[in-house]
Each structure stands twice: as structure tokens, then as C-alpha cells.
Amino acid sequence: MSVSEMPRRRGPRRALTEDEILDAALDLLDEGGPDAASIRGIAARVGVAPNAVYTYFPDKAAVVSGLVERLLGGVDHDVFADPERPWRERVEALALELRAHLSAHPGAVPLMIGGPMDGPHALTLNERLLELLGDAGLDPTDAARAAYLLIVYVFGSIALEVADVHRPGPLPPEAERVADRQAAFSAAPSDQFPRSAQASATMAAYVSTEQYLWGLHRILSGITAREATSDGPEPAETHGRTGLREAHSA
């Protein structure tokens, strides 16, 4: 048998872990945005065949679920765990921590809100939020509704901030993003959009921390007001029902 006919020995199999796969996926998302982390792309990044990735994650959705858990698991619970701090300060600390942590990986944010967040780290964060709202005096039902409202606001705000930047990679500094938005609004004809022109500086700052906290504080004040008036129906709900009845009778 000639040397060329001899069977080739296979090299040692590449060792692989779930953490390596998730690291590679997050790197690809950071570099190329939400479409960059395909199974083939992840496999190429870690130097294995796609089948090796499928051994740990059956599809991209499973990789995304793992990434969601990875990112939520990196949230610092100490910033809102101190029971001696007022509950509003603790909710604000959680909201700011989530914004800072997730905005560091803008390519992952659209994937996070595109599917369920129901892993252990997500459930733990939800439990902590329910505890905070319970400390505010809300009953379990209102605490759950308020928690959902806060989750929608926090993740929705982060998603809109990320979507405002039309290129992959890390978010530019806040001042740069606000300036870019101001330039875009200034280019719009003020005779067609006079109110927008008047409010352009405020609208440009929609992506600012100041705006984020402004909205959060209004929500927290609304939650507090709802608790203070929980013995009777909410005026807005009463108006809505009355208006419908009057419209129907007319």
C-alpha cells in the first residue's frame, strides 16, 4: 500500500462548550447586528462544523434564548436589592442597570424582544420586580400589572434607542446620537411641520437618559396614584364607559 493510499487519521475532536457558542454569537451580534449570528456563522467563528453547534442548540431560537439568559444574568442585582432604599429608587436603579447592560449589546436587543423571556434569570428579575412593587403597597394583581407596564416601557425604550442607529456595532455616545437627531429634524421643512420644529430639541433628546427617566418617573407616579385611589374606580375608566353608553344611546 502506497503512502497516498493509507487511511488518514482524524485529528482530535474540537472541544466545545455552550459558553463558547454564546460568546461567539454575542460577538457576531455586536459586530454585525441581529442578522449576523447564524448557526453557520457561529460555527465558523469557533472553528467547528455547524453540526457541532446543533449538539448544544437545536436551532437559532435556542441560541437566542441562551443569549437572553446570558444577558439578563449579567444584571447587577445589588443595585436594587437594598431593602433600606425607597422602592422608587430601587426600580429606577434596576431600569438604569438594564438600559446600560443591554445597550452595550445593541445587536442582541431586537432578538431579545422578539421571543419569550422565560428562563431562570428572566424569572428571577421578574420576581425581584414584583417584590419591589409589593413593598410599594400594591396587591399581587396590581403588582403584576405594574411589573408588565414597567417591562414594556424599559425594553421598548431600549429597543427604540437601538433602532435609531442605522448601523451595526456599539451605540455612539448619547450626545452624538442626540446631535444627529437634531440635525435630521432641522432638515425637515418647518412650514410643513411647525410643531415638530418647535419641539425639535426635545424630540432629538428622546434617546437621552433624561427622557428615559422622565417617562419612568411618570409611570411610577401613576402606579403610586393608582394605589392611593384603589378604593374606587379609576376616573379614566369611568369616563370611557360613560362615553360608550352615551354614544350608543345617541
List each model region and its residues.
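Short hydrophobic clusters on alpha-helical segments that form packing/core surfaces
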Residues: 21-29, 67, 71, 98, ...
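Amphipathic alpha-helical interaction segments
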Residues: 20, 62, 93, 124, ...
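Hydrophobic alpha-helical connector segments
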Residues: 77-124, 140-141, 147-150
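Helix-turn-helix
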Residues: 20, 24, 28-62, 66
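Hydrophobic alpha-helical bundle segments that form small-molecule/ligand-binding pockets
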Residues: 125-149, 154-182, 204, 223-226
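N-terminal intrinsically disordered/low-complexity leader segments
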Residues: 1-16, 80-83, 191-202, 231-250
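Non-DNA-binding regulatory cores of transcription-related proteins
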Residues: 186-203, 207-214, 218
